């Protein structure tokens, strides 16, 4: 099976007119720029080698020097070039003059009663579409006894307008680059003390089994990953590199609302686990909950799942099903779900609906959720009920929305026009 390419070259994209994709400016890997110098954190090997070539490192040395920097950035978590003890002073000076090891800015950190952490991250500005301020995204760390899961974002905002999802109320600003996606993992390891020789901050909830604090990645944050598939594939490649960040691809899950044409690309080039935001068993209801269903209806979606590269009993597809009171939680819908998934190696994650300001839905009663789970389980499918985590800090499934989008309407309009941007950002609402 092919592995993810770490080169910066891309196959030619075919022009399309998908009505669900809002065209946005491309963001190059050098997007993380601070004080006029691009950061090297989060780059692919190919991009890192290009940066060395750009400052005059001889071609015969580039492979070796790339390996050195790769190790310091992705294994040791170096925050300065000075820390790189096996890199010569001359090269250090060149690197310091041209580049940084900056991470995205941590604007805020919220810690839930259950130990979940949510970070609001600000990326350096990449152009006028970022309003000369830098886009903001959220990522979430969810600790458990046997794992630590980081939920990462792939876009700033989202185009899909799923009616039960808070992120769907935030318009799409742009795709995140592969570098910006990977940098979320680097920031999490910084904040958790998850690099060699470090210890977590006092009071931090982390796995107790001796594993890495961040052991799993889920692309379940802001955005539709498969509308940014090139950068997601590259980010998975960097995250799973055995000589770097070192996460197992079987511990990296990409969740999609059903962008069917990109399933094969994801399965072959990223070899990641697949999760489907299903949430309904009838097209008329899914059209309302997940409007993308009008383009790729349930039958088309499930056929693509049956053909997903590498799917097997050992690599099951996860189907996510949010439990909405009186909407999709009946016994008959549980039985229809079982019928639809027949022949697909699968497990079903039942997700109690997480409320957010302005939502018109309610969470199913606990007894109803248990009954739904029982029907699915008795039919032979694992049907765990996802424990809500981080609800008190709006960090749970479907609750993410970057703080920029919580600006008062007038302030946001001023920002979009480039008027008084610095002053406007003091007007962020706390809700």
UniProtKB/Swiss-Prot annotation:
Arranged from A to Z, the UniProt key words for this protein are: 4Fe-4S, Cytoplasm, Disulfide bond, Iron, Iron-sulfur, Metal-binding, Methyltransferase, rRNA processing, S-adenosyl-L-methionine, Transferase, tRNA processing
| Cystine residue pairs | 151-397
Q: Which reaction does it catalyse?
A: adenosine(2503) in 23S rRNA + 2 reduced [2Fe-2S]-[ferredoxin] + 2 S-adenosyl-L-methionine = 2-methyladenosine(2503) in 23S rRNA + 5'-deoxyadenosine + L-methionine + 2 oxidized [2Fe-2S]-[ferredoxin] + S-adenosyl-L-homocysteine; adenosine(37) in tRNA + 2 reduced [2Fe-2S]-[ferredoxin] + 2 S-adenosyl-L-methionine = 2-methyladenosine(37) in tRNA + 5'-deoxyadenosine + L-methionine + 2 oxidized [2Fe-2S]-[ferredoxin] + S-adenosyl-L-homocysteine
Q: Where is this region: Disordered?
A: 1-26
User: Can you tell me which residues form the catalytic site?
Assistant: 138, 397
Principal cellular location given in the protein's record: cytoplasm
Q: Which CDD domains match?
A: Radical_SAM
Task: Work out whether the entry's keyword set contains Iron-sulfur.
Answer: yes
Function of the molecule: Specifically methylates position 2 of adenine 2503 in 23S rRNA and position 2 of adenine 37 in tRNAs. m2A2503 modification seems to play a crucial role in the proofreading step occurring at the peptidyl transferase center and thus would serve to optimize ribosomal fidelity.
Which family would the database say this protein is a member of? Belongs to the radical SAM superfamily. RlmN family.
Q: What is this protein called?
A: Dual-specificity RNA methyltransferase RlmN
State the organism of origin: Methylobacterium sp. (strain 4-46)
Lineage, broadest ranks:
Bacteria, Pseudomonadati, Pseudomonadota, Alphaproteobacteria, Hyphomicrobiales
Q: Which gene encodes it?
A: rlmN
